[in-house]
Amino acid sequence: MNFIDIAQIKVKAGDGGNGGVYFLREKYRPYGGPAGGDGGKGGSVILQADSSKTTFLDFKYKRHFVAQNGEHGKPKNQHGKNGKDIVIKVPVGTIVIDKKTNDVLCDLVKHGQSCVVAKGGDGGLGNAHFATPTNQTPRKFTHGKKGEEKELILILKTIADIAIVGLPNVGKSTLLLVLTNAHPKIADYPFTTLYPELGVIKTDDKSFTIADIPGIIENAHKGAGLGLDFLKHIERSKYLVLAIDLSSENPVKDFEILITEIYLYDKSLIQKVKTIVGTKLDIAKKENLELLEKLAKEKSLDFIPVSSTTGQNIEYLKEYITNLMNH
């Protein structure tokens, strides 16, 4: 499984350069005053959201990042150069947590958004600062400050307008494929989708992202299966679509499992549930259609039965999603 949605890295900002201890030595001033420049500032460590990144896989091989130190102060009152910042690219949707304090340092939700996670140390003062009427040749200087050093936990939460949530093997991946032309891995066994797949519905003037969330099972909110890993990806979605298999032995129970797991994970997410999509309409049991239609009315939800195999009602579902997003 190459999708990695949590990572731990160490970052070290650059140290500031020390102040210089130098004196002017010019042809006509053999005993010139102090002329040590200040040290340069250390480089900072910056995390930046990049839409071309979709996983933390890069951090499997490199977990320690060090920015450049500032240069020491130079003769003739020349300051040392500042150390270069190091910019680490992460997926859009990355939350950055300081492991030691548990503080959230930043939440990178837009492409190009950046956050300084470790500040470079200030440069030290050269001896030019320490001349006094009674000491014209000071050898005093100050050391550069140490750059910040941190251990960071990175958590990726998928950002999608709509998340398709369902039990394993209900046909979510196939539905995403026919809705968006995304190409998720599809096979006829549970847990084919081991990470969120994203697709895009494009209209004349807008586009909407849809995420196929890996199958949720009973007690997912307690971590059953990969429940907590999966459920966190629905938090940012504007709307949740519940996918229920119309050929299931007990579609009402399937619905109840999904609603319960979402509620127990975060009850505020329930208000995002707007729609039940009945999948596998081509092999549906008639009584299941009736049961889900009745259930949807009781819960004030919309019900749309579809077949990804035959394409029945797929265009209608696209229009429905477009209208939903436009309200």
From Swiss-Prot:
GO CC annotations, alphabetized: cytoplasm
Location(s) in or outside the cell: Cytoplasm
PROSITE patterns per the UniProt record, alphabetical: G_OBG, GTP1_OBG, OBG
Cross-referenced InterPro entries: G_OBG, GTP-bd, GTP-bd_Obg/CgtA, GTP1-OBG_CS, GTP1_OBG_dom, GTP1_OBG_dom_sf, OBG_GTPase, P-loop_NTPase
Binding site for Mg(2+): S173, T193
Chief location: cytoplasm
Cofactors named for this entry: Mg(2+)
Record-annotated Obg domain positions: 1-159
Disulfide bonding pattern of the chain: none
Residues at which GTP binds: 166-173, 191-195, 212-215, 279-282, 307-309
Oligomeric and partner information: Monomer.
Family to which this protein belongs: Belongs to the TRAFAC class OBG-HflX-like GTPase superfamily. OBG GTPase family.
Protein name as annotated: GTPase Obg
Phylogenetic classification of the source organism: Bacteria, Pseudomonadati, Aquificota, Aquificia, Aquificales
